Amino acid sequence: MTRKTSWTLAFLCLLWGWCGAARADEFSQVNHYAVRMFSYGLLTIDSRTGDIHIEGWDNPRLEIEAEKVVRAKSNEAAKPLYEELQVVLQGQDKNVQLRTLYPPRKVWRPFRGEARLSVNYRIKMPFDANLALKCVDGDVWIRGLVGKQQILVNYGDVEIDIPSLDRLRILRAHAWLGYVQSDLHGEDKGGFGPGIYFWNPSGEQDINVKVRMGGVFVYRDDYGSTTR
């Protein structure tokens, strides 16, 4: 068998796996988690696949709704897939970590089955706490937070609503390939390397956003919720 033929067969097998995931139905399971969290604490999120909604509130408590979404041929076939996805919540008060754990990857088929598994999060956290978030593939919405934010997304869109422009000191947002939009200075750019920069010497909130492929949308929250 030639090398070209081997690569062709490998590609066809991978394509067949994707098509199989596409033919399956979607099932979901929702779980809730909660822990005490103080003002100016740090929430660290490490997610691989799935959307994340985060909202700030005036409560010393972190509440999480985790929706496991799987693709399977039946509800019975979906049940063992839920067990393969692990939501891990550790810590409390000043330092909390939230992670999504997937099944170990096999060297010869590193991405087998990953298209079938994702976790969507809806999170409420103290409005003045800090956030560090990493997501490989998914959209992120953040609203009502005045603490520091460090956001890194490989593939997806990030929308941030700024609750107080007076408290914002630095906003750095950059997309390696994609689109940025903001009503802070009226930015509206697309292509390679678009970015947003805002600086207010009297503010105290720092926001840094990096997106590899996708969009960054930053809005003032003066007029209520925004919708893309």
Residue ranges and their predicted role:
Residues 39, 48, 58, 92, ...:
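Repetitive beta-strand solenoid architecture
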Residues 66-111:
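Mid-chain, structured segments of secreted extracytoplasmic proteins
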Residues 92-141, 145, 217:
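Surface-exposed, polar helix/loop patches in the mature regions of secreted/periplasmic/lumenal proteins
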Residues 1-2:
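N-terminal hydrophobic targeting signals that begin at the initiator methionine
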Residues 50-52, 138, 156-162:
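Extended lipid/amphipathic-ligand handling interfaces
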Residues 42-46, 53, 63-65, 97-99, ...:
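Soluble periplasmic/extracytoplasmic beta-strand elements of cell-envelope proteins
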Residues 28-38, 65, 144, 152-153, ...:
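Short, surface-exposed interaction patches in beta-rich subdomains
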Residues 5, 9-13, 18-54, 69-77, ...:
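Short acidic/polar N-terminal linker immediately downstream of export determinants
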